[in-house]
Amino acid sequence: MSMSNPLLNIQGLPPFSQIKPEHIRPAVEKLIQDCRNTIEQVLKQPHFTWENFILPLTETNDRLNRAWSPVSHLNSVKNSTELREAYQTCLPLLSEYSTWVGQHKGLYNAYLALKNSAEFADYSIAQKKAIENSLRDFELSGIGLSEEKQQRYGEIVARLSELNSQFSNNVLDATMGWEKLIENEAELAGLPESALQAAQQSAESKGLKGYRFTLEIPSYLPVMTYCENRALREEMYRAYATRASEQGPNAGKWDNSKVMEEILTLRVELAKLLGFNTYTELSLATKMAENPQQVLDFLDHLAERAKPQGEKELQELKGYCEKEFGVTELAPWDIGFYSEKQKQHLYAINDEELRPYFPENRVISGLFELIKRIFNIRAVERKGVDTWHKDVRFFDLIDENDQLRGSFYLDLYAREHKRGGAWMDDCIGRKRKLDGSIETPVAYLTCNFNAPIGNKPALFTHNEVTTLFHEFGHGIHHMLTQIDVSDVAGINGVPWDAVELPSQFMENWCWEEEALAFISGHYETGEPLPKEKLTQLLKAKNFQAAMFILRQLEFGIFDFRLHHTFDAEKTNQILDTLKSVKSQVAVIKGVDWARAPHSFSHIFAGGYAAGYYSYLWAEVLSADAYSRFEEEGIFNPITGKSFLDEILTRGGSEEPMELFKRFRGREPQLDALLRHKGIMN
């Protein structure tokens, strides 16, 4: 079997071109069985050490991860009916295996024996942390529960894994399930050339004439921002805001209503089973924040600081619309459009006119120049690597001693059958192997930008540049780690509310004149962003800053409060919670038929359940960390080395607050965030 199955015994990088749906389940079954056998085998030993117990377990789990990682990645970037089915059928197997491990008394006792052994005192910080985390995770997998309750735990976890996947599929299908063809260009007045060309290319790819629009962000956003045709904006908003729900043009077709209810009900049951009062308490058991009240207070405090300014920003927008356009009522599909007009009126700048200054190669070489200056790390493209699509590129990161530190796949463009958004995921983690050698980490960096059109290179908006830098921040956290214990290397073991620190930190340079000098360069002439455009860009940075942060707070408070108070007996709780949160924080009145929760994948299909607050929580850390660069010089290699050594290389081996204090010399303060966000005191 292993002869013909490329997922078995992967050495090095995944053989993407050889992986077929029929390989998936047999490989997963075989590898899970190997893992079970190894566990039973190592437990027969009379005495447990790191070498005879942890390392063999790490190796066999690694073989399973190495097969599953490319499969899970393909499910996100090259989704097909066959692949989806193969992926789905493995979820219960993986879930059952992970529950079996988490409730294995023998394994638990072996970890406990290690913790209580004489050798434990000599272990490294990372080794100790990995063992302590494992013991905590046993507790959170129900190791102490009765057999009956353990079985129920397993059922819940397996069902949740299925539901998360179903939620995600519904959103993808609903996004792909709506399109609009427009033949008359006159109906598209105001749309920038790049958006028209992309829509034309999209139509041609389907053998159609005219302009094809979809609900993918590169297609949807330009219409909402620039298109004069209000009816089209409303139609697209309606389709987008009701995806995967019982409302809108595809009402009921891919409806997530029941999926969400069941997810929330099961999460509450899971939390209570493990002895917590609410799912938020369970969520925080592995996070930096100490208790639910601390998170709610943090979010409420930020909302209080931002709301008056948000109201003022909206009044200014309304005043502008009335004065310039005689418009007195703003619907949700008008906000983006008129905000863009107001922004141009105030700052004479728009995202579109900056695109020519951010061609793909210039932006990427600028990003690499930055990490060379601050971290002394070089990025070098490696050709001939097997990938899942011809547009995917592959790079190595090399340090000042010519050591390979890590590598990554870069997949930048939106295409069909690829889930939306931008993300970093790990392909291979850093670890010390049984033979003593070090495995270097590999990451996937995925975005959804417009591909090159005609003979022009891909041209990014400034917002997309920031997104790329953000994901690259996650990437270097994973790739530059110096921890050899895989459970706490890179992003492993990093509390969820601290994981956004490096990513949000990297965004800062996208707003610095000295950095933009080499991140930008006109695709025809190579000249960097002209001074006056740069000045306007920086002035416009905090345009509607409070309205933006209030939108983030709306998501964060909704997620946390919903998980904090959800009660399966009550009906309509999801929409009622959203309504009450909106009345607390939102300045823009929504419409009753909008269904944002139904496509809120972060909390129903991603890892952000009762954790969406993490973005803002970590931004307090990242803004304050960056303020040290502002004080000492934004390319200061000494400050850079300190950030690399104290934070990036440490992975999850120590508590984030300790690492932060080591870098900053004190606890984090909120002021830098408010200043960066343009929230006035």
Swiss-Prot record:
Q: Which GO terms describe its biological process?
A: peptide metabolic process; proteolysis
Q: Where are the transmembrane segments?
A: none
Which CDD domains does the entry mention?
Answer: M3A_DCP
Return the Gene3D superfamilies for the record.
Collagenase (Catalytic Domain) (3.40.390.10), Endopeptidase. Chain P, domain 1 (1.20.1050.40), Neurolysin, domain 3 (1.10.1370.10)
Which EC numbers characterise this protein's activity in its record?
3.4.24.70
Q: How is the cofactor bound?
A: Binds 1 zinc ion.
Q: Does the keyword Metal-binding apply?
A: yes
Superkingdom as given in the UniProt entry: Bacteria
What family is reported? Belongs to the peptidase M3 family.
Q: What is this protein called?
A: Oligopeptidase A
Q: What does this protein do?
A: May play a specific role in the degradation of signal peptides after they are released from precursor forms of secreted proteins. Can cleave N-acetyl-L-Ala(4).
The active site consists of E471
* Listed InterPro entries: M3A_DCP, MetalloPept_cat_dom_sf, Neurolysin/TOP_dom2, Neurolysin/TOP_N, OpdA_N, Pept_M3A_M3B, Pept_M3A_M3B_dom
